[in-house]
A protein has these predicted regions:
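Post-signal-peptide, soluble extracytosolic/periplasmic N-terminal scaffold domains
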Residues: 1-85
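Beta-strand/loop-rich accessory regions of lumenal/periplasmic or secreted enzymes
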Residues: 52-56, 60-254
Length: 254
């Protein structure tokens, strides 16, 4: 992500070097932070991250967790116990452990939990049909499923939740046309990341942790905010069900 310059430096100078910060993980699950000067093409520093913390999970790790779970013998036996044999209809969703990691996973190892859903066809909405009571625990560092947690067979819902045309018994009549016109053009302007509207000016950027960030927000040239971002928004599931009690989704920053 872009390493934003200090507020004081940005106000004093216009021609600044551009810096980026990389938070990554290597193939041995070691986290690291690196800072790079893009203007001079220099690596300024690289530091190891404590094993008490870690970078965001990568897509490669997500796909690896799905592959390991799908190929695990105990997981397949748990599906068979539920009468499920066609693995092509299984959707696996890996989740962060929410700070609750199995004791047989070494401290500092990258770990995920996987929950599953059963589709009745390739285009089905799998989230309407959860496979309850089944959780796979994956050690990404060791490349294996360490445990399949099975809380007993619960019948998979039969109803689907598809909203496509083919998934409906009948369709409603077409709504009446809505026409929104601006004969004199729009009332705002966008130039690169600078947005201007009715005396307001702001710059917008996307931060990999915070999401949308607003910079140098002003009204009629009067400063309002130097920077505004959403630091966090956690959605705890608050359920005692073994499938959900450990979930605390960072919807605003994850």
């Amino acid at each position: 992500s872009l390493e934003e310059p200090d507020k004081k430096i940005l106000k004093e100078k216009t021609n600044l070097d551009r810096f980026v910060k990389i938070v990554g993980v290597d193939q041995k699950s070691n986290g690291f932070e690196a800072e790079i000067n893009l203007s001079k093409k220099e690596l300024l520093k690289e530091e190891k991250i404590s094993n008490k913390a870690g970078p965001t999970y990568t897509l490669a790790e997500i796909f690896k967790a799905i592959e390991l779970t799908m190929g695990d013998e105990n997981y397949q036996k748990a599906l068979e116990k539920r009468g499920i044999k066609d693995l092509s209809l299984i959707q696996i969703d890996p989740w962060p452990g929410g700070g609750f990691v199995k004791k047989n996973i070494k401290n500092g190892n990258r770990a995920l939990k996987a929950i599953s859903f059963l589709k009745d066809s390739e285009k089905d909405n799998a989230y309407a049909r959860p496979i309850q009571g089944l959780i796979a625990h994956i050690d990404l560092t060791e490349n294996k499923v360490v445990e399949v947690e099975d809380h007993g067979v619960v019948e998979v819902p039969k109803a689907h939740a598809r909203y496509d045309k083919d998934g409906q018994e009948s369709l409603r009549e077409n709504p009446k046309e809505i026409a929104i016109t601006q004969p004199e053009g729009v009332g705002f302007s966008v130039e690169d990341n600078l947005i201007s509207w009715e005396g307001w000016q702001l710059r917008a950027s996307i931060d990999p942790i915070e999401g949308l960030a607003l910079h140098q927000v002003s009204l009629n040239n009067r400063p309002i905010f130097y920077r505004a971002g959403l630091s966090d928004m956690v959605v705890p599931y608050g359920s005692s069900d073994p499938m959900h009690w450990w979930k605390a989704v960072h919807d605003g920053t994850e």
